[in-house]
Design a protein with these regions (language model features):
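A broad, low-specificity signal marking well-ordered, structured residues that form hydrophobic/aromatic
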Residues: 12-14, 129, 151
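Low-complexity, Gly/Ser/Thr/Pro-rich intrinsically disordered linker/tail segments
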Residues: 144-223, 229-245
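Short, solvent-exposed loop/turn and secondary-structure capping segments
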Residues: 54-57, 118, 143
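Catalytic alpha/beta core of large soluble enzyme barrels
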Residues: 132-133, 137-148
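...with weaker cross-activation on analogous glycine-rich loops/strands in unrelated enzymes
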Residues: 61-134
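Terminal transmembrane helix and immediately flanking juxtamembrane interfaces
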Residues: 94-96, 137, 145, 169
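N-terminal capping segments
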Residues: 1-73
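Short loop/turn segments at secondary-structure transitions that flank enzyme active sites
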Residues: 47, 51, 125-127, 137
Length: 245
């Protein structure tokens, strides 16, 4: 049976602040092959929903570097899933910047019309919006300090879940963080002269109907999860179709 539950906005903010300047070792870090911002945003949304969508190609899930959906790490794919999802998992809509609240998600657009960065709102105070992000790392950074041409805001309304597969994800999500090297840049805005890197390519979808995978410990998906995706043995270079910062 498919039911709906509340999207836990407080958990999103807590997770965002905890891992803005560190990394959760349960998830691959994409800095070296494009950028980690949408991967980080997906983790934050997972903290507020504890529900993935394992639909092949069009779902929203992460099992490993080569077993993930395009929507987990790609700016535009993330937007498309969150604003059009009719199945299990979080779902939402586009709102105006004047409506923004903590746990909303902001995506920045450059002067060429490309959305390149995903931010997690953690505070709205005295007319200023504060965000957390990865690559470049930011902890409660003012949105006004970013240089961008335009933006769009995603509001997650609720979460659909299958009552057969109710999983408590918090023990896994709140693993000890991995500290970053001290010389890792933090809270630096991408500039137009140095275009933001794009998101690494998503794995190729399975050629036939998926079967149950063997997921990481403590993050067991339902039997509908995809089996093995055709993907390179090591992370590949970013493509023009998946943008991130």
């Amino acid at each position: 049976m498919i039911l709906e539950k509340e999207f836990m906005r407080e958990e999103v903010v807590l997770y965002a602040r905890k891992y803005a300047l560190t990394r959760n070792p349960l998830f691959y870090t994409f800095e070296g092959i494009g950028g980690n911002c949408t991967n980080f945003a997906s983790q934050c949304v997972l903290a507020g929903s504890c529900t993935m969508n394992y639909t092949a190609v069009y779902g929203w899930y992460y099992l490993s570097i080569n077993r993930r959906s395009a929507s987990w790490t790609g700016v535009d794919y993330f937007f498309d899933f969150m604003t059009t999802n009719q199945g299990v998992g979080p779902y939402g809509r586009v709102i105006t910047i004047s409506e923004v609240q903590p746990a909303d998600l902001i995506q920045l657009q450059n002067s060429e019309g490309r959305f390149y960065h995903t931010l997690v709102v953690t505070k709205v105070e005295d007319g200023e919006i504060y965000i957390c992000a990865n690559s470049n790392d930011a902890l409660d950074r003012p949105l006004s300090s970013y240089d961008y041409a335009s933006l769009r805001v995603i509001r997650i309304d609720a979460v659909r879940y299958d009552t057969r597969y109710v999983i408590d994800c918090f023990e896994a999500l709140y693993s000890p963080p991995v500290e970053l090297p001290q010389n890792t840049p933090q809270s630096e805005a991408p500039s137009e002269s140095e275009p933001a890197p794009e998101e690494p390519s998503a794995p190729t979808p399975p050629a036939q109907a998926p079967t149950e995978p063997t997921p990481p410990e403590r993050l067991e998906p339902p039997p509908s999860a995809p089996a093995t995706e055709t993907a390179p043995a090591s992370p590949t270079s970013p493509s023009e179709n998946e943008a991130v910062q």
